[in-house]
A protein has these predicted regions:
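Conserved AAA+/SF3 P-loop NTPase catalytic/coupling segment centered on the Walker-B
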Residues: 103-128
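Residue-level signature of catalytic and energy-coupling elements of molecular machines
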Residues: 25, 45, 82, 110, ...
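Conserved Walker
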Residues: 46-49, 70-72, 90-99, 129-136
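Pre-Walker A (pre-P-loop) alpha-helix and adjacent loop at the N terminus of AAA/AAA+ ATPase modules
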Residues: 6-51
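Loop/turn-to-beta-strand initiation segments
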Residues: 41-42, 67, 103-107, 129-135
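Conserved alpha-helical scaffold flanking the Walker A/P-loop in AAA+ ATPase domains
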Residues: 32-35, 88-112
């Protein structure tokens, strides 16, 4: 019988092997990203355009079976686009919550520096506290 630690190592090696079929030459990045995901942490990837950051995020979500969302940040992205918002359902007369992009297992925030400070704060709150405030 395998010990839990050996099982985690074997599964991690299998995951990395699957990812290497899609992402070539980024072994260190794959390893650190997998470690961050397993630790329920966050990772900041900085690189020039076109080197596969989005492809890597999609590959991780598929290999690990995680839900995935991506937002291309611009100055017109609102905090409610990230956290969600309530809208009136005119047929029932009730308010319904529409989930924002951050409600997923793996979220890619592309060009976060272009967002307004309020939008950045909404995302950072969700990251730090693992929850967020949304008006209902």
């Amino acid at each position: 019988m395998e010990t839990p630690k050996l099982s985690i190592v074997a599964n991690s090696q299998n995951i990395l092997q699957q990812l290497r079929k899609v992402i070539v030459g980024k072994d260190s990045t794959l390893l650190w990203t997998l470690a961050a995901i397993l630790a329920k942490g966050h990772i900041l990837l900085e690189d020039i355009p076109g080197v596969g950051k989005t492809t890597m995020a999609v590959a991780f979500s598929k290999v690990l079976g995680l839900s995935y969302n991506r937002v291309q940040f611009t100055p017109d992205v609102l905090p409610s686009d990230i956290t969600g918002y309530s809208v009136l359902n005119q047929t029932t007369g009730n308010m319904e919550y529409k989930a924002g992009a951050v409600l997923c297992n793996l979220f890619l925030a592309d060009e976060l520096n272009r967002a307004t400070s309020r939008t950045q704060s909404a995302l950072l709150e969700a990251m730090e506290e693992n929850n967020f405030s949304a008006l209902r």
